[in-house]
């Protein structure tokens, strides 16, 4: 038995056509625009912010090539050659005329100029090493997604030499014993990051903990705000120098200023959101007013800022990018600071009474 046919359904409105996506026109990039282009990482939102900050850091580290800079460089070269030629002529004339005063003055001026040129070359070399560290992180990122063989071990051995690790170092020996000829570049770099790099990272973490604790205690017990500010600034600069030395970077005057500026730039872009994400909920879940005084709470804040500065200095001085779970957390330093303050301040009160 067949089922009865259903009645016809008439639609009053016509069918709507699908909206076709509007495609943007092709855009060509010149050489200057290509230098400022950095691909976006398809990762989580928190990591997108870090990638954007890393792109800004790379852009700040890269020297900007422009026509004016080339013209100034050419002018400086011509001026230097002219000064050298004129100095040689003055020395020759003074020697022929036996003008010993002019000869001595010319020699002294030449020594001063040589000392200045030597210091400039030394500063440029140190600044170049700081820029090279950012390029090494880019190479490490490429090797961490590479399936090739041979480049990873050479790259890691170069990093070990830069860090001052000899062949007899236990961490380096464990890494070499774990290598196999079937390992690709990604596996070799990951083994280095897990076996060798923590030997330097642990030293940097210990330095950050020590400097953060000293800053927190200084703010908590000192009644002079101006002295506190000067002490914190001096200790923060020393912390950056210490971390750079641990990772094999020798800082000069300009490279130290560049690194300090990059650390502050990094903190300004990613500091507030990360501080709230890592510390905020844990901080609000505790009754700090019942545990510590207002002055001690200010000390914890200063210590956390020092720790934040040290973490970003680590990030800029490390030759390898952070792997999953390796990056230090502000919450760990906060717990250490609170324990140290709770153990130190009562002792000071008892001794005072």
UniProtKB/Swiss-Prot annotation:
Membrane topology, record value: Multi-pass membrane protein
Localization: Cell inner membrane
Domain of life: Bacteria
GO CC annotations, alphabetized: plasma membrane
Keywords: Cell inner membrane, Cell membrane, Membrane, Transmembrane, Transmembrane helix
Residue intervals passing through the bilayer: 71-91, 101-121, 214-234
Record has Chloroplast as a keyword: no
A UniProt-annotated Pfam family: DUF697
InterPro entries: DUF697, UPF0283
PANTHER family on file: UPF0283 MEMBRANE PROTEIN YCJF
Family (UniProt): Belongs to the UPF0283 family.
Listed name of the protein: UPF0283 membrane protein YpsIP31758_1791
Organism: Yersinia pseudotuberculosis serotype O:1b (strain IP 31758)
Lineage: Bacteria, Pseudomonadati, Pseudomonadota, Gammaproteobacteria, Enterobacterales
């Amino acid at each position: 038995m067949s089922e009865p046919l259903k009645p016809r359904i008439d639609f009053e409105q016509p069918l709507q056509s699908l909206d076709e996506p509007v495609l943007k026109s092709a855009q060509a990039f010149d050489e200057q625009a290509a230098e400022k282009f950095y691909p976006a990482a398809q990762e989580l939102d928190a990591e997108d912010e870090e990638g954007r900050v890393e792109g800004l850091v790379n852009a700040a580290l890269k020297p900007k090539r422009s026509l004016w800079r080339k013209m100034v460089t050419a002018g400086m070269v011509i001026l230097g050659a002219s000064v050298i030629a004129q100095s040689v002529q003055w020395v020759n004339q003074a020697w022929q005329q036996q003008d010993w005063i002019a000869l001595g003055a010319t020699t002294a001026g030449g020594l001063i100029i040589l000392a200045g040129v030597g210091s400039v070359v030394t500063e440029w070399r140190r600044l170049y090493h700081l820029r090279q560290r950012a390029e090494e992180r880019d190479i490490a990122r490429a090797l961490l997604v590479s399936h090739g063989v041979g480049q990873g071990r050479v790259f890691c051995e170069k990093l070990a030499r830069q860090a001052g690790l000899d062949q007899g170092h236990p961490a380096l020996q464990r890494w070499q014993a774990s290598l196999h000829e079937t390992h690709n570049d990604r596996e070799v770099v990951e083994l280095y990051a897990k076996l060798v790099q923590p030997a330097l990272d642990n030293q940097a973490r210990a330095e950050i903990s020590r400097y953060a604790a000293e800053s927190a205690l200084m703010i908590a017990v000192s009644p002079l705000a101006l002295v506190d500010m000067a002490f914190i600034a001096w200790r923060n600069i020393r912390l950056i120098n210490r971390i750079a030395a641990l990772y094999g970077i020798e800082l000069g005057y300009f490279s130290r200023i560049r690194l300090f500026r990059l650390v502050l730039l990094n903190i300004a872009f990613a500091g507030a959101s990360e501080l709230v994400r890592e510390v905020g909920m844990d901080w609000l879940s505790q009754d700090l007013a019942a545990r510590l005084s207002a002055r001690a709470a200010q000390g914890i804040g200063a210590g956390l800022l020092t720790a934040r500065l040290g973490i970003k200095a680590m990030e800029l001085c490390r030759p390898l990018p952070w792997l999953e779970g390796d990056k230090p957390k502000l919450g760990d330093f906060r717990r250490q600071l609170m324990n140290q303050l709770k153990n130190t301040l009562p002792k000071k009160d008892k001794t005072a009474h």
